[in-house]
């Protein structure tokens, strides 16, 4: 049997995704103007966050990710959401080692709920395409 590993777009590096993959556009390390802009939004109000995810995550990733990348991203988050004791707070912590920082004023009060909302958006944007490609992903109402 021959297995081809999925690569990052335009790269030779193997593709992987953590449950926090959708947060990458909101990283503000060394991006003061971006932090100032994002600080206007309340991450605890998903009505405010939805347009940000649509514009800075889905719109960008739809141009570069194929259905297999989308499936890997969704399945990673789905697996975490299905794990009853998964520590979503850990994904939101500032990380000096990787230089991962959110806007200073972003304090997400209900991390699991925040990631459930992200999964819902993923399913809305990518679910049909991923399912039609043969992947088994859970609809949001089965895991939320």
Give each language-model segment a name:
Residues 10, 14, 44-47, 54, ...:
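Detector for Asparagine
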Residues 32-85:
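Amphipathic alpha-helical interaction modules
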Residues 24, 28-31, 58, 62-66, ...:
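Generic surface-pattern signal
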């Amino acid at each position: 049997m021959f297995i081809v590993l999925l690569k990052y777009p335009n790269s030779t590096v193997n593709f992987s995704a953590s449950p926090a993959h959708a947060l990458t556009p909101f990283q503000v390390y060394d991006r003061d103007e971006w932090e100032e802009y994002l600080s206007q939004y309340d991450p605890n109000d998903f009505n405010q966050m939805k347009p940000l995810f649509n514009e800075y995550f889905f719109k960008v990733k739809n141009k570069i990710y194929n259905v297999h990348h989308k499936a890997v991203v969704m399945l990673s988050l789905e697996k975490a959401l299905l794990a009853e004791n998964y520590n979503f707070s850990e994904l939101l912590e500032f990380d000096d080692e990787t230089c991962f920082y959110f806007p200073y004023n972003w304090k997400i009060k209900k991390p699991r709920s925040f990631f459930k909302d992200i999964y819902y958006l993923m399913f809305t944007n990518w679910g049909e395409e991923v399912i039609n490609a043969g992947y088994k992903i859970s609809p949001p109402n089965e895991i939320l």
